[in-house]
Amino acid sequence: MIAAFFDLDGTLCTEHVWQAFNKYFTEHHRRRLLVKAFLATHLSLWPLHHLGLVSRTRFFRLWINHMPWLLVGLRPEEGQEIFRWVTDQALIPSLRPDVAEVLRQHQAQGHQVVLVSGAFEELLACLGERLGVQHVVGTRLELNRGRYSGRAIKPCFGPDKVALLTELLAKRGLEVDLSQSFSYGDSVFDVPVLEFVGNPVAVYPDRQLRDYASQRGWQIIGEPKES
């Protein structure tokens, strides 16, 4: 079978997951101190990145590793309420029409579509339901005594995306012809999944991915980002 792997933030959606969660907690007046502390601690790293004191890889890995803090102490059913709100109020409205149409074309051709993202796997499952996508690969949340611990079991980032995707394909018994399959991503951090297939597509790429894709003759969808 032929598969099509889609990244989320910046690729399928313009809204970033952390922005969507911030919007939820702000509008519902919940966990305001926790969210402010999280944003203050992590946004403050961006100037350090520009000064060369924190690598871009470390900056984004810290975000993905620490995002589960926002849900610490919540029960899974409380989490589902948040994931549904984020999906319906933030992610679905921010779908890129052209990329969503590409996804639908893959579905119409009978290709196996998989969402592959650093976002929480439970959130991706909610979005997958709305889009008719059965399989997702994301960051798995740890539970402790029936509540979210604030830690990730396995963050889904960079090369780990390929390992987790391979695990999913084997677990579900999906025999995919990778040489004929497609992958869509917007960031240089998506390169491992893009190179995993025969048809990589850079979508509204950052500068590094734009250059990387151009050198290799990959298809590019949308205007490249300048930053």
Predicted regions and their residues:
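Metal-dependent phosphoesterase signature
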Residues: R61-P97
